[in-house]
């Protein structure tokens, strides 16, 4: 009799994905972030479900319902802060996962990469709508500013914004629909993640060398299951340190003030994980130009495979490209820092330079450097 693990219609899918999956023998800890993202997603769905049981999506009671969760619900405070800081951990894992893909040339799997980009956009949309729900000052004004960007679209812009708002300003209708979308999107993300994995398992994982590893495969379990469990333990340790010792470290104090349409906060800024894109948006004095740059700052990932000019897939043996990659990382840190600063000299100039550098590295310097490295190989 065959093992039920290999014969049962449902269990064999799990078996072929997480147990008997042939995996390259040399994938490093940078390959842990896929499983960590899965854990983050499950954690967010579970904590979000329990929060939704006590939250009310109404402008008059939303803020006090969040306070009620923290004060009166059993362990409500830990659920709320795990959800809020879980989003930060989610984005840390996302950025590292995308960075790994760029460094080791994982974008050469086009289907997996493109679904990954769709996932990134969906997660960003979900996080943005979730930030609006507590209905604090930064929730309200963040929603107003970001949705208002759509008015830059010629001809239909204003109508589009009012359609999204469900009125002439961010109000009860906006909050209700944002709650509905914030609830449904994680399940769409879950479905997309399954498709992401499906395409990945068609080709098999990439590895640090960027060369085929068919001749040297090992079973996923126990080798990588134990490695993933270690990653999960470290992730949970970091999350719980954040939640239990400084839960508001990454939040904005303005969000502890109930939303007031008559009083604008001095500095409107999104959560830290959107700051790099926010800086690129602010760096262009023209509204439509800023919006296009904002979208393109993420969408640029979609054309990365077309810009791959190197004869080698991975950057492991390409020191010049490595220098550019780490310059890009430093540039993203700079953009993130500038996004949290007021719009004044010298921050405007630094932000503009960092924005130009971001696009220059990805569109011009990296492909050009790869060609130089190809020629150096001939020596």
Curated annotation (Swiss-Prot):
Q: How does this protein sit in the membrane?
A: Multi-pass membrane protein
Q: Which GO terms describe its cellular component?
A: mitochondrial inner membrane; respiratory chain complex III
Sites where the protein binds a ubiquinone:
201
**Which Pfam families does UniProt cross-reference here?**
Cytochrom_B_C, Cytochrome_B
Cellular compartments annotated: Mitochondrion inner membrane
Keyword field contains Electron transport: yes
Give the cofactor binding note. Answer: Binds 2 heme b groups non-covalently.
- Provide the cofactor list for this protein: heme b
What keywords appear on the UniProt entry?
Electron transport, Heme, Iron, Membrane, Metal-binding, Mitochondrion, Mitochondrion inner membrane, Respiratory chain, Transmembrane, Transmembrane helix, Transport, Ubiquinone
The positions annotated for binding heme b b562 are 83, 182
List ligand-binding residues for heme b b566.
Answer: 97, 196
| Gene3D superfamilies per the UniProt record, alphabetical | Cytochrome Bc1 Complex, Chain C (1.20.810.10)
Please provide the Gene Ontology terms (biological process) for this protein. mitochondrial electron transport, ubiquinol to cytochrome c
What GO MF annotations does this protein's record show? metal ion binding; ubiquinol-cytochrome-c reductase activity
Residues annotated as transmembrane: 33-53, 77-98, 113-133, 178-198, 226-246, 288-308, 320-340, 347-367
- Give the free-text miscellaneous remark of the entry: Heme 1 (or BL or b562) is low-potential and absorbs at about 562 nm, and heme 2 (or BH or b566) is high-potential and absorbs at about 566 nm.
Q: How does it assemble?
A: The cytochrome bc1 complex contains 11 subunits: 3 respiratory subunits (MT-CYB, CYC1 and UQCRFS1), 2 core proteins (UQCRC1 and UQCRC2) and 6 low-molecular weight proteins (UQCRH/QCR6, UQCRB/QCR7, UQCRQ/QCR8, UQCR10/QCR9, UQCR11/QCR10 and a cleavage product of UQCRFS1). This cytochrome bc1 complex then forms a dimer.
The record's listing under PANTHER family reads: CYTOCHROME B
Q: What does this protein do?
A: Component of the ubiquinol-cytochrome c reductase complex (complex III or cytochrome b-c1 complex) that is part of the mitochondrial respiratory chain. The b-c1 complex mediates electron transfer from ubiquinol to cytochrome c. Contributes to the generation of a proton gradient across the mitochondrial membrane that is then used for ATP synthesis.
Similarity annotation: Belongs to the cytochrome b family.
This protein is called Cytochrome b
């Amino acid at each position: 009799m065959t093992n039920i693990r290999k014969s049962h219609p449902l269990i064999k899918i799990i078996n072929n994905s997480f147990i008997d999956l042939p995996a390259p023998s040399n994938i490093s800890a940078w390959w842990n972030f896929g499983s960590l993202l899965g854990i983050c997603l499950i954690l967010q769905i579970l904590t979000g479900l329990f929060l939704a049981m006590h939250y009310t999506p109404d402008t008059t009671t939303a803020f006090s319902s969040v306070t009620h969760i923290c004060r009166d619900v059993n362990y409500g405070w830990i659920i709320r802060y795990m959800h809020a800081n879980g989003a930060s951990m989610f984005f840390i894992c996302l950025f590292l996962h995308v960075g790994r893909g760029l460094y080791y040339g994982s974008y050469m799997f086009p289907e997996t990469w493109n679904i990954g980009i769709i996932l990134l956009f969906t997660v960003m949309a979900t996080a943005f709508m979730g930030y609006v729900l507590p209905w604090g000052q930064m929730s309200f004004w963040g929603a107003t500013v970001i949705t208002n960007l759509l008015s830059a679209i010629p001809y239909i812009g204003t109508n589009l914004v009012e359609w999204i708002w469900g009125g002439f300003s961010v109000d009860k209708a906006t909050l209700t629909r944002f709650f509905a979308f914030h609830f449904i999107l994680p399940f769409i993300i879950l479905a997309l993640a399954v498709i992401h994995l499906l395409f990945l398992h068609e080709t098999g994982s990439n590895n640090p060398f960027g060369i085929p590893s068919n001749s040297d495969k090992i079973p996923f379990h126990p080798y990588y299951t134990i490695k993933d469990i270690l990653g999960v333990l470290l992730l949970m340790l970091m999350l719980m340190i954040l939640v239990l010792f400084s839960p508001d470290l990454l939040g904005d104090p303005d969000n502890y003030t109930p939303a007031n349409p008559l009083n604008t906060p001095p500095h409107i800024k999104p959560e830290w994980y959107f700051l790099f894109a926010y800086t690129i948006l602010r760096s262009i004095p023209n509204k439509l130009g800023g919006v296009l740059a904002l979208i393109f700052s993420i969408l640029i990932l979609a054309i990365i495979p077309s810009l791959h000019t190197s004869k080698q897939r991975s950057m492991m043996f390409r020191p010049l490209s490595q220098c550019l990659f780490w310059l890009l990382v430093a540039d993203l840190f700079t953009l993130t820092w500038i996004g949290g600063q007021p719009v004044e000299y010298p921050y405007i100039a630094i932000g503009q330079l960092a924005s130009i550098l971001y696009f220059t590295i990805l569109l011009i310097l990296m492909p050009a450097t790869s060609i130089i490295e190809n020629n150096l190989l001939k020596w």
